[in-house]
Amino acid sequence: MEYSKINSIGELKDSGWESKSIKDELRDNLILSRKNNVNLFSQIHGYDETVIPDLERAILSKHDINFLGLRGQAKTKIARSLVSLLDEFIPVIKGSVLNDDPFNPISHYGKELVREEGDNTPITWLHRSERFTEKLATPDVTVPDLIGDVDPIKAANLKLSFSDFKVINYGLIPRSNRCIFVINEIPDLQPRIQVSLFNILQENDVQIRGFNFRMPLDIHFVFTANPEDYTNRGNIV
């Protein structure tokens, strides 16, 4: 497919491209790599009979993943290697901070643009190298950092009410829609922050300071944890 020639939703429909979730992407590409005898984890040594088979089963089952191990056991390296299982390029609505799927936008910006422009809605292509977000969990990480908050400066500049969805400044997790999102050292994340992730993991409910709306985020979550850390310094809720 010549991505550079497809610049609108109408052209995307004509190309025959089909939308799929990130977990389906990972699953389909893992199956394809196995059929072609391609080892995507060739740079990871010593885990061929332990970690890698479990990881592959988790991907095939479309599960989020938690790597538990001591320092230096390649937890983060394995997480980063999952990028190779993503499609090389995916289309997104141009200008969307949430990487909106042209056929199924979730942001209010994306929905309004598709409603106004229809098949003329402009799209751009996102490379798989840009679909990986990594956050180190530290005690000072807040809910607005991860999920988002109301931006009073934007509201004042645009003369908008605080009830307008346009005043929301989305955090790292919504901005990682259709991406792999890694939280390293999850025990260091405050328990109340971990609890705030439950709604996203289970129900896709995003709650931002007075806003309560369902946002079906399409994210593959990966967590890493050190058993020494979560017994001495923190815990996993």
Where do the model's predicted regions map?
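Conserved ASCE/P-loop NTPase catalytic core
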Residues: E2-I236
